[in-house]
């Protein structure tokens, strides 16, 4: 998805947010306040790394992050997870595999109080504008290659137009 808050732009003229070597947190569950992600934010600051949050954040954590970015405490960007429902979960799982993250999901029993740095992934670069976000990952794991092959096999058997499009989009996302 696209950059949510202009305060996160690193290039205001081009309306871009570029993060080099960001840590990446992903969630399908709402993050109600900044305390719930405080441990991973502190980890990013101590590690001198930027942070990309692909998560539905409520207004309090968004405001707190914008203030901390404005003060120069952390380089951060927040984008909404792409798509909806099961498609959202599929796409986030694919992205997580690509960047080495764990998707936070309360519906699967994850505790909002147990968001830790070991859930974070990383990319070489993340660039967001008003139209979307591109993650640059130079090294693709064997698991990513296996997922691409699995999706291609599934696609070859699929005849429903909506599912064909969804599978094609997922293959494109993982293939870069």
Which residues does each predicted region cover?
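Long, structured protein-protein interaction/assembly regions in large complexes
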Residues: 1-176
